[in-house]
Amino acid sequence: MENILVLDVGTSSLKAMLYNEAGRLLNRASYEYHSNFFSSSYVEQNPHSWHDALVSTLKESAEFIEFNKLHLDAIAVTSQRASVIPIDKDGRTLHNAIMWQDKRSLAQCDQLLAQLSMKDMYYRTGLRANPYFSVPKMMWLKDERREIYDKAYKLIGVQDYIVYLLTGAFVTDWSQACRTMLMNINTFSWDDDMLKISGID
């Protein structure tokens, strides 16, 4: 492998960093955006800002690669985790991303704990019921924004959305799935009981 472009989708900016096979940083492009704080509990971002950031940083990176006559072998994507974006079958976003630091889903955490002990939940998922993670946010959408939940084809994370923009495919990986509270860390598969008690389908 000669060169790899790493896309890091953070909370305040997207960074595109080009490395050679020795790990030397060859070029860095970045694009800033912001979160919307609607209250002490509600934190959202417009996913279109990530699209704009992706286009801008890829363009700058491509110009550097072309000017220096380099070959790009791979693109890797990493991101903030546990944020939730509802999208339709065509990949259109239906609501702002509910961000990882959003705390609106405390009641949904209580709903989970009413059906499964914290100990059992931790054994299955490696996580404790907390609004930080994805599934309480998904449950909040179902409870409080039902029309959006019903229209959604998928509820995905930030990294998954960027991969979709790059490839047109809806995929995730263990590093993202494990922050949803829906992945069983013992089997590395979706946990049927967590899906059932959360009501996420």
Predicted feature residues:
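N-terminal glycine/serine-rich phosphate-binding loop of ATP-dependent small-molecule kinases
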Residues: 1-95, 123, 151
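Secondary-structure boundary motif
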Residues: 63-67, 114, 143, 147
